[in-house]
């Protein structure tokens, strides 16, 4: 056959279908990793995918309730082609959230483990060249208690926008946020994991075709909250250059606390540990198996509305703590002092954040579609752990939101608006204003669209529910079947906005509706079937809540309780 035909054959093998002839192998600081090439329909250049790349040592044994340590080096080529286990969590809750939020066609089989500090990488770069593509690091949501990286497939965003997408995991629940409020277990382990993942990106992403000098962190819900915490944290300074918080910011009262003792005591007691001292609790909890801690976790009834107990003694979240390390002070103090990373920042909310998914998961009794004033008042008080509204202010709040109508269906809708404003809308505007006032480029959006991929159980009237923008951000119409042209175009536009922002710190670009910067005029973008600029998002609501919180503070005895908004 001669030599030349053989060379031509091997070249043909390289270039047919755009696949290189052998799977990608990349050097990391700790050792080589083997990935796989995946093609997206309509693209000749495949995306190299690496799944389950370790960014820290497994946080087991004495490393439980301890800062993450660097991974041990390896001398072989590590196979990183299968999904890593998600961090320990309630398997049912994790499964439900993953199925509701995934942009994939098929649900991936879920596994859970305390050994979970892994990330996934999607890179469209030609790995033989020294590409320096923008990097987008995704932090998943799930109330800091459930969720995982692999629910979100970065393939479409990576291929369409020529960016490196990294999805990271971090410890959750007891494992991620158990705190005694002192040196024995400071807490915020999950946030320290996020910082460790960003450090790993700085040290390694160049070999995957990414630019460590252009890293955007983005996340949704507790992921958006985490992004907002990292913007405020001195530990994350210079580890990223732009940030996007979708439906969650550092002033989300439910997810942050100064008062950790009662939660620590509850976790210890439910685990059969003595609570005599912090050291005793931590030592005992470190001896528990993963399954035993999971049992404790299930008893905590995390992310559930407690309709029976005293709202002031109900702890449906294992929150971030003001620990003096990740957060030197309370977020509102850091914001007021303007002592944070003034990177370009996109902050957004969805039109109906409390539309269906959150009330359903938390067990709010709203299914019959009606709500009277008395029940609304009771639900608001039962929601104290989430809203932090003092009991004597509840009638004022209920009257303001629900008082204008006798229609019980309308009252239910207004109650959902109230919940959305307190948890998402008002904190998002306050954070955006603080960011703007510190001199950082800031952009706001409100997302209003009903994806075709959502659960059939969801009422038709819910448009722009919590999490709905994820389908657009991660290009679901290019991975799942059945999207209309309108939905496909919406996803193209949103991916373009997000990636332009990752590239330039500004979402605007050719062929896109103009997105005004959030300045003193408070222009923002309404994103949906028709996308257009508007002004002063939640302006009246922010004023109402600011007045209410001021009254609350004035009435409170001198013992200061941590208050948001």
Curated annotation (Swiss-Prot):
Listed EC numbers = 3.1.1.1, 3.1.1.67
Tell me the Pfam families matching this sequence. COesterase
**Intracellular or extracellular location(s):** Endoplasmic reticulum lumen; Cytoplasm, Cytosol; Lipid droplet; Microsome
> What's the top EC group for this one?
hydrolase
An annotated GO cellular component: cytosol
Tissue specificity statement from the Swiss-Prot or TrEMBL entry: Highest expression occurs in liver with lower levels in adipose tissue, kidney, heart, intestine, lung, testis and thymus.
Induction data: By di-(2-ethylhexyl) phthalate.
Q: Which GO terms describe its biological process?
A: acyl-CoA metabolic process; acylglycerol catabolic process; cellular response to cold; circadian temperature homeostasis; cold-induced thermogenesis; cytosolic lipolysis; lipid catabolic process; positive regulation of transcription by RNA polymerase II
Q: Where is this motif: Prevents secretion from ER?
A: 562-565
Fetch the CDD domains from UniProt: Esterase_lipase
Family per record: Belongs to the type-B carboxylesterase/lipase family.
Its biological purpose is as follows: Major lipase in white adipose tissue. Involved in the metabolism of xenobiotics and of natural substrates. Hydrolyzes triacylglycerols and monoacylglycerols, with a preference for monoacylglycerols. The susceptibility of the substrate increases with decreasing acyl chain length of the fatty acid moiety. Catalyzes the synthesis of fatty acid ethyl esters. Hydrolyzes retinyl esters.
Q: Name the chain's protein.
A: Carboxylesterase 1D
Q: Which organism is it from?
A: Mus musculus
């Amino acid at each position: 056959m001669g030599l030349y035909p053989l060379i031509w054959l091997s070249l043909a093998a390289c270039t047919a279908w755009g696949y290189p002839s052998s799977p990608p192998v990349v050097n990391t600081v700790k050792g080589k990793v083997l990935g796989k090439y995946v093609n997206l329909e309509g693209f000749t250049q495949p995306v190299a995918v690496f799944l389950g790349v370790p960014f820290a040592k497994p946080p087991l044994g004495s490393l439980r309730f301890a800062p993450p340590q660097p991974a041990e080096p390896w001398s072989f080529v590590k196979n990183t082609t299968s999904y890593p286990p998600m961090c320990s969590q309630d398997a049912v809750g994790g499964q439900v959230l993953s199925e509701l939020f995934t942009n994939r066609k098929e649900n991936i089989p879920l596994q859970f483990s305390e050994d979970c500090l892994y990330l996934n990488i999607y890179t469209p770069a030609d790995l033989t060249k020294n590409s320096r593509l923008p990097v987008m690091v995704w932090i998943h949501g799930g109330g800091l208690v459930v969720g995982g990286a692999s629910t979100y497939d970065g393939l479409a965003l990576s291929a369409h926008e020529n960016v490196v997408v990294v999805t990271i995991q971090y410890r959750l629940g007891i494992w991620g946020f158990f705190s005694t409020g002192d040196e024995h277990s400071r807490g915020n382990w999950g946030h320290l994991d996020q910082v460790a993942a960003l450090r790993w990106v700085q040290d390694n992403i160049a070999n995957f075709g990414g630019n460590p000098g252009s890293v955007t962190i983005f996340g949704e819900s507790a992921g958006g909250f985490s992004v907002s915490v990292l913007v405020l944290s001195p530990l994350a300074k210079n580890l990223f250059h732009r940030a996007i918080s979708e439906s969650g910011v550092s002033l989300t009262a439910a997810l942050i606390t100064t008062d950790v003792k009662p939660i620590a005591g509850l976790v210890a007691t439910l685990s059969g540990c003595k609570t005599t001292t912090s050291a005793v609790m931590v030592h005992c909890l470190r001896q528990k198996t993963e399954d035993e801690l999971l049992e404790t976790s299930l008893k905590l009834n995390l992310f559930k509305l407690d309709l029976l107990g005293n709202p002031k003694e109900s702890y449906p979240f294992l929150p971030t703590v003001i620990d003096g390390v990740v957060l030197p002070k309370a977020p509102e103090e850091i914001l007021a002092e303007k002592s944070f990373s003034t990177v370009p920042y996109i902050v957004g909310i969805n039109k109906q954040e409390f539309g269906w998914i959150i009330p359903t998961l938390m067990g709010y009794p709203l299914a019959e579609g009606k709500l009277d004033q008395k029940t609304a008042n009771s639900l608001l008080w039962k929601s104290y752990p989430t809203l932090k509204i003092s009991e004597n202010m509840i009638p004022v709040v209920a009257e303001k939101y629900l008082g204008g109508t006798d229609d019980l269906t309308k009252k239910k809708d207004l109650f959902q608006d109230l919940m959305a404003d307190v948890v998402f809308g008002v904190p998002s505007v306050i954070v955006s204003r603080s960011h703007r006032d510190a001199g950082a480029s800031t952009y706001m959006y409100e997302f209003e669209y009903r994806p075709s991929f959502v659960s059939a159980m969801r009422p038709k009237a819910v448009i722009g529910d919590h999490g709905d923008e994820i389908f657009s951000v991660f290009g679901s119409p290019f991975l799942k079947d059945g999207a209309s042209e309108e939905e496909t175009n919406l996803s193209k536009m949103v991916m373009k906005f997000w990636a332009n922002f990752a590239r330039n710190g500004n979402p605007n670009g050719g062929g896109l509706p103009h997105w005004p910067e959030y300045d003193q005029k408070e222009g923002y973008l309404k994103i949906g079937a028709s996308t257009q600029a508007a002004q002063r998002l939640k302006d009246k609501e922010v004023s109402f809540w600011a007045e209410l919180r001021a009254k609350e503070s004035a009435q409170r005895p001198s013992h200061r309780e941590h208050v948001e908004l």
